[in-house]
Amino acid sequence: MSVFRRSVQCVGVLPSILAQRSSLLARPANLQFLKTNSSKFVPQVTANVSRRMYHKNVLDHYNNPRNVGTLPKGDPDVGIGLVGAPACGDVMRLAIRVNKDGVIEDVKFKTFGCGSAIASSSYVTTMVKGMTLEEASKIKNTQIAKELCLPPVKLHCSMLAEDAIKSAVKHYRSKQLTPVGTTAGAIESATA
């Protein structure tokens, strides 16, 4: 590997893009300039790029996520939705606690994914708290995407959030249909 390419990697600039101009940049004077001045301009370039990539609403929910955590899986008033997107590796776990009136009184999430996935999870938890199960089941990913100003390439994150809340509601309802002390498998075999 040439001195130029090693220097560029240390600076954090993409070597494949600059390699086309290596004859100009590989001059000793230019290499010295990069070594002495890289810390002055590279962080600013990085900061400007990251600010442009995400909308302020996404950054707010990403930097200050609301309702992070878990709820006990064994609690009969808790429903859990676990969804994932194989294409990008995002995984969301969303848990809801429902009161006796069918209103979601607490919501928690844990998400492994990009900033848009975390922001979508955080936003949907603030959205559904206080809703009935029926209202929460009607949430559409377009509402989430519109509020967070997600670009088309990140719409799958809002779809995951929609799927997670619907899965949590479905899980909660299935737990309510299962009599205490039995399992769903035992009920199915008893009725067959």
From Swiss-Prot:
Pfam family, one: NifU_N
Keyword field contains Oxidoreductase: no
Range annotated as the organelle transit peptide: 1-53
Molecular-function annotations in GO: 2 iron, 2 sulfur cluster binding; ferrous iron binding; iron-sulfur cluster binding; iron-sulfur cluster chaperone activity
GO biological process: [2Fe-2S] cluster assembly; intracellular iron ion homeostasis; iron-sulfur cluster assembly
Cofactor(s) needed for function: [2Fe-2S] cluster
GO cellular component terms given for this protein: cytoplasm; mitochondrial [2Fe-2S] assembly complex; mitochondrial matrix; mitochondrion
Gene3D superfamilies: 3.90.1010.10
Cofactor info, note text: Binds 1 [2Fe-2S] cluster per subunit.
N-terminal signal peptide: none
Compartments in which it is found: Mitochondrion; Mitochondrion matrix
Stretches assigned to coiled coil: none
Pathway terms, separated by semicolons: Cofactor biosynthesis; iron-sulfur cluster biosynthesis
Quaternary assembly: Homodimer. Component of the core Fe-S cluster (ISC) assembly machinery.
Family according to the record: Belongs to the NifU family.
Function: Scaffold protein for the de novo synthesis of iron-sulfur (Fe-S) clusters within mitochondria, which is required for maturation of both mitochondrial and cytoplasmic [2Fe-2S] and [4Fe-4S] proteins. First, a [2Fe-2S] cluster is transiently assembled on the scaffold protein isu1. In a second step, the cluster is released from isu1, transferred to a glutaredoxin, followed by the formation of mitochondrial [2Fe-2S] proteins, the synthesis of [4Fe-4S] clusters and their target-specific insertion into the recipient apoproteins.
Protein name as it appears in the record: Iron sulfur cluster assembly protein 1, mitochondrial
Lineage: Eukaryota, Fungi, Dikarya, Ascomycota, Taphrinomycotina
